[in-house]
Amino acid sequence: MSNSKIMLGNEAIARGAYEAGVKVSAAYPGTPSTEVSENIAKYDEVYAEWSPNEKVAMEVAIGASQAGTRSMASMKHVGLNVAADPLYTCAYSGVNGGLVVVVADDPGIYSSQNEQDTRMVARAAMVPVIEPSDSEEARKFTKLAFEYSEKYDTPVILRTTTRLSHSQGVVNPEDRVCPEDKVYEHNFAKNVMMPMNAKKRHIFVEERLKKMAEDACHMEINTVSYNDTSIGVITSGIAYQYVKEALPEASVLKLGLVHPLPEKLIKEFASKVDKLIIVEELEPVIEEQVKSWGIKASGKDLFTVQGEY
């Protein structure tokens, strides 16, 4: 008998974090992210708190990560501005236990004061971004985010949007697998970002992103479907659902890891289609990077940078 359930995207993120063995969750409420923390608080194995603000939530999660346990911070897009200081520094110092930062963007400005794109912040902070396209991926990608965090020694942003956070889909829950806490090691050069240490860690961060971009060409999180090659679409997140509905016969490169981008995979896909279209809500983050590689593509000349699609 199937144990499938219908879950909100945010509920599925909480489930994925639980299954990944998260022990600490800190958040500041704000639509469309609130239900992540509300749902993870239902699991007795997880310490969950509403923090005074997003910066404190980030610092709680970073502290738990450095102590060796898997941890998560959750907030909406404008909350990431408040949490920027510890996030940027943690990008340099890295993690001990896996650290995932769930950030919910709000295309269409349903409950926010602006329409900023978290991918732009992540690019500046040099932090990788994972973006699911439905509730089941929200569960699975959250688990992958913790694996990537520990493998590459980095915080990982899980980006969602209002439409994904508040829509429901079929989810296939799995058992919780709780890895042993990692031993905390006193490491001044890695954990304390004084100038003498930060200079060396900046080099590490640049090399980390380069390595991750190379590995992304073979990651299960990025998928290619070749159908009619007269049109090829590169897309990610909830926009993938719109592409499937509007262009069911098109070839599609669906990116689960949206920063850093898999250059070799994208170039290979572009070479096999006649016309390349990039479909992404809000800023032309993917489009600008693809065009910087000399690839001809359409994107924001066809679609707006405002609102939902």
Per-segment meaning from a language model:
Residues 1-135, 226-227, 285-287, 292-309:
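Thiamine diphosphate
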Residues 2-10, 132-309:
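Flexible, low-complexity linker and terminal segments
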